[in-house]
């Protein structure tokens, strides 16, 4: 990923930290992970009028981050510790589950 400005809603960041114990400032570091993988967020709950992406990247531990692109800015929507299946996808140990994930730019 090229250098981009990272942004997020401070209130959403606070709520996210209370729920998942992941700070958005830390989550922003996943975009610097050269091994980061991503996929389009096609989850049922995604009803936004914007393209959302899911990414897995290492920041002390593997994080699962949902974000969107707004011009030259990357806006973090949510972040949490990756679950077992997502970790296997990140490490490349689950070829079947890696479907849809691709190496990030």
Label each region the model flagged.
Residues 1-105:
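Ribonuclease/tRNase effector modules and their secretory precursors
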């Amino acid at each position: 990923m090229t250098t981009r400005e990272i942004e997020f809603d401070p209130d959403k960041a606070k709520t996210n930290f209370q729920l998942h114990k992941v700070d958005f400032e830390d989550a922003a570091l996943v975009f610097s992970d050269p091994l980061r993988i991503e996929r389009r967020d096609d989850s049922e709950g995604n009803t936004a009028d914007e393209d959302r992406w899911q990414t897995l990247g290492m920041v002390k531990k593997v994080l699962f981050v949902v974000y969107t692109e707004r011009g030259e800015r990357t806006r973090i929507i949510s972040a949490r510790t990756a679950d077992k299946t997502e970790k296997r996808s990140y490490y490349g140990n689950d070829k079947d589950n890696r479907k849809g994930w691709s190496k990030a730019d």
